[in-house]
Amino acid sequence: MDNKMDMRAVACVLLAAGAGSRFGGGKLLAEFSGERLFERAMNVLPKELFSRVAVVSGCEDILAESERRGFLAVRNSAPEKGVSLSVRLGLEAAKPCSAVLFLVCDQPLLRKESVLRILEAGAAHPERIIAPEGPDGRLGNPCLFPAAYFPELAALEGDRGGKRVIRAHPEAVLTVPLPEEELFDTDTKEDLSRLKEI
């Protein structure tokens, strides 16, 4: 990988506090190919490349596994306040750093190689927001934000996440093409069943 990556303190925030209401609750504990969804997300992280990994969750199982792996376990006691609180908590735990990769737990087909491609794009263009793009042109997760955008991320409210910051700065976004199945997020049990057939 580009040596510039080693010179930048890039942190990762794993967002794992969602209630999964459309799933019927407990979404991140659901299994896919023998692993719980949150474990699959942890396993695609090239953790040796990050200055630190912060996992934001209100679930004891997820927090305990985070600590076991040497990650920072960040408790979100009020997930009902929306994803903005998780972003803020994760951002504070990740500092000091020059960029943060925000990763979600409900994309079970996301591959480590794709995460590496996003990090490599960030190393080559450290001033840009890096976002994966599907074949249909829609942007997905994970997204890499340089420190210049931390104040805007910290100011988010309610159920608004990093996509709001991306929409405010389209000129700053550099996209990395990824296959549709890697960006597909599992909102329902039916979604998970459909992914198992791919």
Give short role names for the model-derived ranges.
Residues D2-R8, P151, A155-I198:
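Conserved alpha/beta core of the MobA/IspD/sugar-nucleotide pyrophosphorylase nucleotidyltransferase superfamily
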Residues M5-L139, E171-L178:
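Nucleotide and nucleotide-moiety/phosphate-recognizing core
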Residues R88-G90, A148-L153:
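Short beta-strand and adjoining strand-loop segment in the mid-core
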